[in-house]
A protein has these predicted regions:
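Detector for Asparagine
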Residues: 3, 14, 26-35, 45, ...
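N-terminal low-complexity, Ser/Thr- and acidic-residue-enriched intrinsically disordered segments
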Residues: 1-56, 60
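Serine hydrolase/lipase
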Residues: 104-107, 146-149, 167-225
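A broad, low-specificity signal marking well-ordered, structured residues that form hydrophobic/aromatic
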Residues: 10, 98, 108, 202-203
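Gly/Ala-rich beta-loop-alpha elbow adjacent to hydrolase catalytic centers
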Residues: 154-158, 162
């Protein structure tokens, strides 16, 4: 089974920022789940020339020209384009989780979006609680998938959710976190043996000047700056 590279997973994480905005229509919707639409199909009608000329900064602090370059690269990657949207969860806090699956290769990816507007209180709770509501919801989303050998990925709070599920779910065999915050002392006290058992699944990437990934104590096998 071929797996997406960590660079490809960063593209998936960035695609989570697409919503009804500027040149974009929201691709993360029930219709695309019901149709099991592929990434390629969902990106097909995005006009990258218009994106290049767009003068607004999109969600995730991504410019139109940056989006255009990224989407063109994704469209040229059949391994990403063939992934189908098979499940999605968006709650009252606008937290988004998606499950993507390739029928031919058996690859499965769960991607968590970064902090939504309604999740800031949950971020603060993560500083002193072993488990937060949003972490438990992320774990429940992974556990309801009818697949094993799942790769989980996310940026910022999404990265924290990915690491949390990698520690606690046997369905997860790989985790890639981009600038994800760490965990509380209560988390380490409650899950010490599971952390030691499962941290080998986790690769972390962090910018030198990013403050989120240094919050609290992190969990990983490898960390790249």
């Amino acid at each position: 089974m071929a797996n997406l590279s960590d660079e490809d997973l960063l593209f998936l994480s960035n695609l989570m920022h697409i919503k009804e905005e500027g040149q974009f229509k929201n691709i993360w919707n029930k219709k695309n789940v019901d149709n099991k639409s592929s990434i390629g199909e969902m990106l097909e009608n995005i006009d990258t020339d218009k994106l290049k000329d767009s003068d607004i900064t999109y969600d995730g602090e991504i410019s139109g020209s940056e989006w255009a370059a990224m989407i063109e690269k994704v469209k040229d990657n059949p391994q990403i384009c063939n992934l189908k949207l098979v499940d999605m969860d968006i709650d009252d806090k606008k937290a988004l989780s998606v499950c993507l699956h390739n029928d031919e290769t058996g690859e499965t990816y769960v991607v968590f979006r970064g902090t939504s507007a309604g999740e800031w209180p949950d971020n603060f709770e993560g500083g002193y609680k072993a488990d937060t509501e949003q972490q438990r919801r992320a774990l429940a989303f992974v556990e309801r998938q009818n697949f094993d050998n799942i790769t989980v990925v996310g940026h910022s709070k999404g990265g924290n959710k990915a690491k949390y599920t990698a520690i606690l779910s046997d369905k997860v065999d790989r985790c890639v976190s981009f600038d994800g915050q760490g965990f509380s002392a209560a988390f380490y006290e409650k899950y010490g043996p599971l952390i030691e058992q499962n941290k080998s699944k986790i690769n972390c990437y962090a910018l030198d000047n990013d403050f989120v990934n240094i919050l609290m104590s992190d969990v990983y096998e490898n960390k790249t700056y």
